Amino acid sequence: SSAAFIVDAAKINLPSGKKSLALYLYPEESNGNNGWERSTEYTKASIEHYSKKWYEYPYPVAVNVASNVGGMEYPAISFCGYKAKGGDLWGVTDHEFGHNWFPMIVGSNERLHAWMDEGFNTFINEISTIHFNKGEYHRSYGTKNFLTQALFNPSLEPVMSSPQNMRERHIGYLAYYKPAYALRILREEIIGPERFDVAFRKYIEYWAYKHPTPNDFFRTIENETGENLN
């Protein structure tokens, strides 16, 4: 517990001109040394980027609370670790608020298809991080050894497996990094960013507040790009 909480807020500029507010609550102990004093900046930048790039944020407020959990998201409110600083605080903030798009706006079934939740979110997080403050916190996905484990380890279950059918130690690779990297390859090496981004925006637009399956995603991208993804 803390003797005092700091409340900070800033206007979020949405493409349509609608109003939204970034609101942060954190204990005074989390302030300073590139800590939570930048939290409102992070939330504002994250939501403005996703709103302009993909689909407008639908809620009148975006609340982040410093807490004793590493990161947990709900519509319009997130809880992030009170000890996080710098790139770690940006990363968890951007990730948890990214979940407002997947699976809040696009309501895929995260219990069956985790890659359509965590994987899609991890994918858009990297693009957001590249654009934030001229890439202040952008890093590569990891070492060659990490990528080998994430992409080519023969002991990994299929990405399409449900989380219940994955070994717990594999969930990070299968739900987050492998699908995110696959989308990156699809965007940058196969389709091209310009065409892919148009198709991905259309996918979000078509399936906003609905419950798409993997086939719905594949079909939408194929229809919008004219490419066969088989």
Where are these regions (language model features)?
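Hydrophobic helix-coil surface modules that form long, contiguous segments used
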Residues: 1-94, 123
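Active-site-adjacent bridging/hinge elements
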Residues: 18-19, 70, 95-100, 148-163
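Loop/turn elements at helix/coil->beta-strand transitions in domains of secreted/extracellular proteins
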Residues: 18-21, 56-62, 98, 191-196, ...
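Second-shell loop/turn segments in exported
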Residues: 28-37, 79, 83, 110-111, ...
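Zinc-dependent metallopeptidase catalytic helix centered on the HExxH motif
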Residues: 37, 79-143, 200
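Active-site-adjacent structural elements in folded domains
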Residues: 63-65, 84-88, 162-171, 184, ...
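Acidic/His/Gly-enriched intrinsically disordered linker/tail segments
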Residues: 112, 118-189
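Amphipathic alpha-helical substructures
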Residues: 172-230
